[in-house]
């Protein structure tokens, strides 16, 4: 179900654009739903099957349980795990601990739950330089156990609390449902001029929203002169520093993150 909800978040804003301008958006932008979500869905399915098998093959075996045994026999097999006075208590606890490591992919997997990302949305290849903010281990496998907050394009916008005029909000709650959000740290160097119908600008710092505990400053991946562009589904689309030519290149950046042309 969670994966299905993620699918909807990914697709609905793309459908809105395709309905508003079919000629412009019915191609690659809609196709990107498959490019982005299919690998995630496949990974979730494989993980779910692994977890299902692990319950029977690892945990049930460690506890000494079996579908072929009677309820009384299963209860007797499990009892030493809970009662240190019974023979085999230490061995049973050790076996369960070993089995639990196998089940960490189900019960201890924040990396899997919130660290997933869309490699196809990393248009400028930033993830290759940082192993996607650490979410990939040195040998290239996905770190299921730990979540590594990152603003590499394709990743979920990290959580941070912000506050303005007595109102506290989660940073992600600032993301509009049908427009991009440009999070900037300064409002005096040109970023606000990039605002348009499809891009809302919010300032975190410099008289705008207050970064309550500094977590956004630690996670944003750019300086306070930089900015992070977020899609309506909460996925980082672009990040960068201000330069004098950015305003001229901005339409190309937007076209790229909308799968309309090559990287700008």
Over which residues does each language-model region extend?
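Extended, hydrophobic alpha-helical segments in both membrane/secreted and soluble proteins
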Residues: 1-16, 29, 40
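Helical substrate-recognition/capping region of FAD-dependent monooxygenase/halogenase enzymes
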Residues: 17-264
């Amino acid at each position: 179900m969670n994966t299905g909800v993620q699918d909807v978040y990914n697709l609905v804003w793309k459908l809105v654009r395709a309905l508003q301008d079919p000629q412009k958006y019915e191609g690659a932008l809609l196709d990107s739903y498959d490019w982005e979500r299919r690998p995630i869905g496949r990974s979730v399915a494989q993980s779910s099957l692994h977890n299902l098998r692990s319950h029977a093959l690892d945990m049930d075996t460690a506890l000494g349980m079996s579908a072929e045994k009677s309820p009384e026999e299963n209860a007797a097999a499990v009892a030493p795990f809970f009662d240190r006075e019974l023979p085999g208590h230490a061995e049973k606890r050790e076996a369960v601990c070993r089995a639990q490591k196998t089940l960490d992919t189900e019960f201890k997997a924040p990396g899997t739950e919130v660290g997933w990302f869309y490699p196809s949305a990393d248009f400028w290849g930033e993830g290759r330089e940082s192993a996607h903010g650490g979410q990939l281990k040195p040998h290239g496998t996905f770190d299921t156990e730990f979540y590594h907050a990152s603003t590499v394009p394709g990743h979920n916008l990290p959580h941070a609390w912000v506050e303005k005029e007595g109102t506290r909000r989660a940073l992600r709650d600032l993301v509009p449902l049908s427009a991009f959000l440009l999070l900037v740290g300064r409002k005096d160097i040109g970023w606000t001029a990039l605002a348009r119908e499809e891009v809302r600008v919010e300032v975190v710092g410099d008289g705008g929203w207050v970064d309550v505990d500094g977590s956004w400053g630690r996670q944003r991946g750019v300086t306070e002169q930089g900015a992070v562009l977020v899609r309506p589904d909460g996925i980082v689309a672009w990040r960068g520093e201000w330069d004098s030519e950015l305003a001229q290149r901005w339409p190309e950046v937007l076209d790229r993150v909308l799968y309309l042309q090559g990287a700008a």
